[in-house]
């Protein structure tokens, strides 16, 4: 129905030609958009390689040639995102992606600094430039809260997301909020998902909607850490989270394949179709009907909002966003955050 969110699939097999094959399969089975995932080491490496390059690990290497070949393969209706959010090549990635014709990118200073391995000062400087470049290319960017996966509570992650989103607006950008639908360390410890996976995820959307009127794109991918090695269970979990997102009226979702969801191992084209078909079936099942969260959802949303306000007040009192990242105000070592070191001492200050 027209109420369902835009569905993005993640790709990053390591080989651009394999990526193209997977993308074309997903287009044929109804994907609205695709997201380029690069290797994690790319975020900690200055500069880019060039040429047509493949490797046998997770993520597809960013080169102009690799991205250009992928872009040329896309159907005209397929949205294309190249993530640039967490490393030493954040602004450069936005420029390359924008030149080639990407529709969207991904930038979050807090996540990249606290869980992505990049020095907070370096990433803040780079991200400001990246947001400006994204604005020049008219590329909206999502602000994902992946630091939740490290253990940072949702309210702290959301505070960081809101700061970066406000910065994006000030710089002429078009930020999109991307909270996680996941089984995070926070809920494992505190028990918010002992009964169901609905309430806490719904609380996130209620909380954000009560604070700001902004597009919401749930990720990343939805259902992270709820899937198992079983392809049926994995696909079902993705589909149920997709239906929850649709019930909550969000604008977009990112889904993984049924094997990619739990493993950094091989990703097969068939497993991509698993989750696309399951998501389609769940949308058909619910139609305009909705899931109904319990009263806990609104209670946790209120608690989340109070936590966000306290974090933002502490950042303002501190007086420096960069120092707040170093000091753990947006996620501490006790939470599971670890300020990155890649690019440390590389920022030059004018006298």
Which ranges hold each PLM region?
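Intrinsic disorder/low-complexity detector
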Residues: 14-24, 95-99, 162-166, 327-351
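Alpha-helical scaffold segments in soluble metabolic enzymes
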Residues: 25, 96, 203, 207, ...
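Long, compositionally biased intrinsically disordered regions
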Residues: 272-351
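Catalytic alpha/beta core domains of metabolic enzymes, predominantly
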Residues: 113-268
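Electropositive phosphate-/nucleotide-binding environments in soluble metabolic enzymes
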Residues: 13-20, 57, 87, 195-198, ...
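Generic secondary-structure signature for well-ordered alpha-helical cores
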Residues: 31-32, 206-214, 247-251, 280-295
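Active-site beta->alpha loop and helix N-cap motifs at the rims of alpha/beta catalytic domains
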Residues: 1-158
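Short acidic, glycine/proline-enriched helix-loop-strand junctions
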Residues: 52, 56, 120-125, 264-284
């Amino acid at each position: 129905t027209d109420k369902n969110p835009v569905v993005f699939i993640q790709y990053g097999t390591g080989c651009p030609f394999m990526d193209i094959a997977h993308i074309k399969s997903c287009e044929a089975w109804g994907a609205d958009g695709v997201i380029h995932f690069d290797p994690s080491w790319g975020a900690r490496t200055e500069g880019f390689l060039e040429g047509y390059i493949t490797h046998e690990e997770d993520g597809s290497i960013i080169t102009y040639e690799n991205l250009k070949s992928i872009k040329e393969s896309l159907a005209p209706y397929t949205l294309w995102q190249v993530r640039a959010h967490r490393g030493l090549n954040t602004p450069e990635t936005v420029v390359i992606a924008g030149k080639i014709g990407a529709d969207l990118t991904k930038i979050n200073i807090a996540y990249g600094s606290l869980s992505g391995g990049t020095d907070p000062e370096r990433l803040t400087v780079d991200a400001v430039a990246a947001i400006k470049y994204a604005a020049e290319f008219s590329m909206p960017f999502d602000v994902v809260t992946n630091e939740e996966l490290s253990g940072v509570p949702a309210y702290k992650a959301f505070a960081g997301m809101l700061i970066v989103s406000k910065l994006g607006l000030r710089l002429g950008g078009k930020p999109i909020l991307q909270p996680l639908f996941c089984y995070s360390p926070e809920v494992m410890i505190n028990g918010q998902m002992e009964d169901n996976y609905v309430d806490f995820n719904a609380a996130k959307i209620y909380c954000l909607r009560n604070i700001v009127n902004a597009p919401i794109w749930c990720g990343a991918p939805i259902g992270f850490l709820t899937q198992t090695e079983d392809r049926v269970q994995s696909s079902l979990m993705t589909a149920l989270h997709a239906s929850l997102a649709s019930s909550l009226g969000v604008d977009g979702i990112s889904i993984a394949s049924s094997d990619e969801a739990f493993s950094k191992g091989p990703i097969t084209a068939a497993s991509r179709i698993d989750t696309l078909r399951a998501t389609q079936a769940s949308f058909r099942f619910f139609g305009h009907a909705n899931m109904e969260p319990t009263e806990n959802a609104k209670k946790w949303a209120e608690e989340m909002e109070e936590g966000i306000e306290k974090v933002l007040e502490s950042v303002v009192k501190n007086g420096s966003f960069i120092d707040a990242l170093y000091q753990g105000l947006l996620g501490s070592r006790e939470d599971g955050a670890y300020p990155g070191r890649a690019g440390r001492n590389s920022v030059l200050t004018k006298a």
